[in-house]
Amino acid sequence: MQTDTFKDKVVIVTGGANGIGRCISDEFRNQGAIVYVIDKQEGEHYVGDISKKEVLEAFAIEVLSKHNKVDVIVNNALPLMKGIDECSYEEFQYALSVGVTASFYLVKLFMSHLADGASIINISSSRDRMS
């Protein structure tokens, strides 16, 4: 159902090309938001690996060149993880870069542009290993 609950609100969603992130992005759009997705997967959104500082900086410049405020940041991107016995040090470091460092840095980049009453939503789940 389409409403205008978030009409003209600027929303950022990491990992918004598929799954939960895609549903979140679609729902915000259905409620009138202007949604910016960043994802590693090719598509009609900003494509980039958020584990890289320069990618996050370029994304922030892109968003802020069009809007001077951000109302919602949804940190949703997380790489698939293996169990501790199968996960290499490098894979774990990458997971930390995407799931922790990128979330911190993205908020830091937009901090002075957050609208009054802005929301920061951090999503974490291990459900993919339970289904």
PLM region spans:
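Canonical Rossmann dinucleotide-binding motif of NAD(H)/NADP(H)-dependent dehydrogenases/reductases
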Residues: 4-35
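Conserved catalytic-site loops of classical short-chain dehydrogenases/reductases
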Residues: 71-72, 93, 118-123
